[in-house]
């Protein structure tokens, strides 16, 4: 009898999780469909980029069935703020990303997408983690981004940014598909863990809020990457001093 009750409760909780799951984005036909409620305003940037000299930090190439994406990451070469950040954090940030999409069987670039962030008060950080957390499972890395395959020709490109030591890091996700580059997620979130299985990748996230008594109220989420879709599940909240 106890076993039956346990299995029943397990099934109920599984159903509740399915009900609470919400779609962040999905690929429908040739279109990336997303929800604006998961995209907070991007950082403000009013700098004249043409007057800034950049140095290339890294480069990745993503092969798709319909072509490939040539992605390059840059940071400014000089400036007082840049020197301060280099001295404080090390050379682990960038402020410009250029994505060149080359369609199959074509010799020239068919589409270029450029993301700038030269506002200085907000850094897009390499996936080093150690600047903001001491969790030992997170290995230091000089990777400018994380890439998750959603299918043979679609990718989720994850960037991690930080405004200052007070705000939680920002997780920004772009989906690349058939030459399209679309921002589908931009929220203040800390990454507590990353889990993978044969069919999905799960990012366990935490957002921090404060109640009227200045107690921390973490909200916990699972961000699930699976075939041609990203979904999110709110797990629970807890209060602590």
Predicted regions and their residues:
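Short, solvent-exposed loop/turn segments at conserved positions within beta-propeller repeat blades
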Residues: 86-94, 164-169, 216
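Acidic/hydrophobic-patterned starts of short beta strands in beta-sheet-rich repeat architectures
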Residues: 60-72, 149-161, 201-205, 215-216
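Acidic, small-residue rich beta-repeat scaffolds with periodic aromatic anchors
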Residues: 21-58, 66, 77-89, 174-241
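Short glycine/acidic-enriched loop and turn motifs that connect beta-strands
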Residues: 77-79, 162-166
